[in-house]
């Protein structure tokens, strides 16, 4: 039986449904990071206040420019995505997003749905009493926002002893726990708010994770493993394996210095392999970004970099896992018009031309160049400006895509309606340049990486490289020599 997919409201905090974001440094508090599309669909009833734009800081030396460019991007993320540095498993990275529930004919997903329905059958017929009990219980067990009040030493489900709070957001909180039934292993438990819409989103993510974990029980394809889920005092709790920092948080804590080429190669191959697994299972992730790519372990070595005049961290083991399947969509489900976080959003999504698996490939291309540079090449919150940045980096948009789009306000006479001499136009011209000009070296491996990125950033989704093809790209040949 096909169950309905809830309408996604971009004003819900996108990071709130992502396991990845909670794996950041625990020394800072996180702010709420809202979905970048929130400012584009004001009809949603959950309103977020606007913030002012921040501009690229120019400085005298090349090193200073690179550093300030990265700082600009971080400030941009803070301003326009509600990003807050800080706790592992949480908000910017945090992508336990409030997305729609899935509709699929697959028995694995519908069986969970029916099980959940039967479990709450009685309370559904006594909604008034249920809401009264919930409100009353919050004075004892929940805070005013619906978070479960808990502290170190508390035990969930007579099994998971809380040792630390890793992060907190609109969806709930994530805690690190000791699993006393499995030899004291450490796990991450997401405790969802006792609020209907967040519970529904959690159920949607559980369904996808159950399917993926059953299909790949040993995590060969590097999707995060959900160990189990349970209810605790009205809160859905999802138990995950404990992972390291997100790749974004590692870059951020490393002063926005990029990854080494050999690490980029290994990470890129694992990401492509993981997402290709999703695609082969008729799923599109729809929210790939560095915050949703987590290191299995984020141990690092540190040495002084005389060129950058600061200490530089090098990850010891670049193995990764992909997280946050709250927005993953099956081929036969309803496809929301707007998906993906702004920086990683494909042109067919911006132009409302419809999307499928190729939108994930575009996102991966954006991720790889961010790993290479240390910052995103599309730092914007505006669709018209985003398209202008694309044209500056990748050349003119294809005429057939312009002619098909319903977003006519972005175009005039089948060309992007963009004034290069305006302040915004000058900013884009200064901030962006043709793709190959971002190359830091003309060495063969750099050429191969940019060839792969260029194929991933093909405008036309029908011509964009598939991940099955990408895994055979010459950039990955050195990996195959060692296997």
UniProtKB/Swiss-Prot annotation:
The record's annotation in Gene3D superfamilies points to: Phosphorylase Kinase, domain 1, Transferase(Phosphotransferase) domain 1
Compartment(s) where it occurs, according to its Swiss-Prot or TrEMBL record: Nucleus
Keyword Kinase applies: yes
Q: Name one GO biological process term.
A: regulation of RNA splicing
Spell out the Low complexity composition-biased ranges. 84-111
- In this chain, the stretch annotated as Disordered covers 1-49, 84-146
> Superkingdom of this entry's organism?
Eukaryota
Q: Recorded E.C. number(s)?
A: 2.7.12.1
Mutation: residue 190 to R; reported impact is: Loss of kinase activity and changed localization in the nucleus
* CC terms in the record's Gene Ontology section: nucleus
- Determine if Transferase is one of this entry's keywords: yes
PTM sites of type Phosphoserine: 61, 139
**Active site per UniProt:** 287 (proton acceptor)
Activity regulation, in the record's words, is: Regulates splicing of its own pre-mRNA according to its kinase activity; increased expression of the catalytically active form influences splicing to generate the catalytically inactive splicing variant lacking the kinase domain. Leucettine L41 inhibits its kinase activity and affects the regulation of alternative splicing mediated by phosphorylation of SR proteins.
Q: Where is the composition biased (Basic and acidic residues)?
A: 37-49
- What GO terms are given for molecular function? ATP binding; protein serine kinase activity; protein serine/threonine kinase activity; protein serine/threonine/tyrosine kinase activity; protein tyrosine kinase activity
PTMs? Autophosphorylates on all three types of residues.
Q: What class of enzyme is it?
A: transferase
UniProt keywords (A-Z) are: ATP-binding, Kinase, Nucleotide-binding, Nucleus, Phosphoprotein, Serine/threonine-protein kinase, Transferase, Tyrosine-protein kinase
**Comp. bias regions, Basic residues:** 26-36, 112-137
Q: Where is this motif: Nuclear localization signal?
A: 29-33
Tell me the function of this protein. Answer: Dual specificity kinase acting on both serine/threonine and tyrosine-containing substrates. Phosphorylates serine- and arginine-rich (SR) proteins of the spliceosomal complex and may be a constituent of a network of regulatory mechanisms that enable SR proteins to control RNA splicing. Phosphorylates: SRSF1, SRSF3 and PTPN1. Regulates the alternative splicing of tissue factor (F3) pre-mRNA in endothelial cells.
What name does this protein carry?
A: Dual specificity protein kinase CLK1
Q: What species is given as this protein's source? A: Mus musculus
The gene designation is: Clk1
């Amino acid at each position: 039986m096909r169950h309905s997919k809830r309408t996604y409201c971009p004003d819900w905090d996108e990071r709130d449904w992502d396991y990845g974001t909670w794996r950041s440094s625990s020394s800072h508090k996180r702010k709420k990071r809202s979905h970048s599309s929130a400012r584009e669909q004001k009809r949603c009833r959950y309103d977020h206040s606007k913030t002012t734009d921040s501009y690229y800081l120019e400085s005298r030396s090349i090193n200073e420019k690179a550093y300030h460019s990265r700082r600009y991007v971080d400030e941009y993320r803070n301003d326009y995505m509600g990003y807050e540095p800080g706790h592992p498993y949480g908000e910017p990275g945090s992508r336990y997003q409030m997305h729609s529930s899935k509709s699929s004919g697959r028995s694995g997903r519908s069986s969970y749905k029916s099980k959940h329905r039967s479990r709450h059958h009685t309370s559904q017929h006594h909604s008034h009493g249920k809401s009264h009990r919930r409100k009353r219980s919050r004075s004892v067990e929940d805070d005013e926002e619906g978070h479960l009040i808990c502290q170190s030493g508390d035990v969930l489900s007579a099994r998971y002893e809380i040792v630390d709070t890793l992060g907190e957001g609109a969806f709930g909180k994530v805690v690190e726990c000791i699993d006393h039934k499995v030899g004291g292993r450490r796990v991450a438990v997401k405790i969802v708010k006792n609020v209907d819409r967040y519970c529904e989103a959690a159920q949607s993510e559980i369904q996808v994770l159950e399917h993926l974990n059953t299909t790949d029980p040993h995590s060969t394809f590097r999707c995060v493993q959900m160990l189990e889920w349970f209810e605790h005092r009205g809160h859905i709790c999802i138990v995950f394996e404990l992972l390291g920092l997100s790749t974004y948080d590692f870059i951020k804590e490393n002063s926005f210095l990029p990854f080494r080429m050999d690490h980029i190669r290994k990470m890129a191959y694992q990401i492509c392999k993981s997402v290709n697994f999703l695609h082969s299972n008729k799923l599109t992730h729809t929210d790939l970004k560095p915050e949703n790519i987590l290191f299995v372990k984020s141990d690092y070595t540190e040495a002084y970099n005389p060129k950058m005049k600061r200490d530089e961290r090098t990850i010891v083991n670049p193995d990764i896992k992909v997280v946050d399947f709250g927005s993953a969509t099956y081929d036969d489900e309803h496809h929301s018009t707007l998906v993906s976080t702004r920086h990683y959003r494909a042109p067919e999504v911006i132009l409302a031309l419809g999307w499928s698996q190729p939108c994930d490939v575009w996102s991966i291309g954006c991720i790889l160049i961010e790993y290479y540079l240390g910052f995103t090449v599309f730092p914007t919150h505006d669709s018209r400006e985003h398209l202008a940045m694309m044209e500056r980096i990748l050349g003119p948009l294809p005429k057939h895509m312009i002619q098909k789009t319903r977003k006519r306000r972005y175009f005039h006479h089948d060309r992007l309606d963009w004034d290069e001499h305006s302040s915004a136009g000058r900013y884009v011209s200064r901030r962006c340049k043709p793709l190959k000009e971002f190359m830091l070296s003309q060495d063969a491996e750099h050429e191969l990486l940019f060839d792969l990125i260029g194929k991933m950033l093909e405008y036309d989704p029908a011509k964009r490289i598939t991940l099955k093809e990408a895994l055979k790209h010459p950039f990955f040949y050195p990996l195959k020599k060692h296997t």
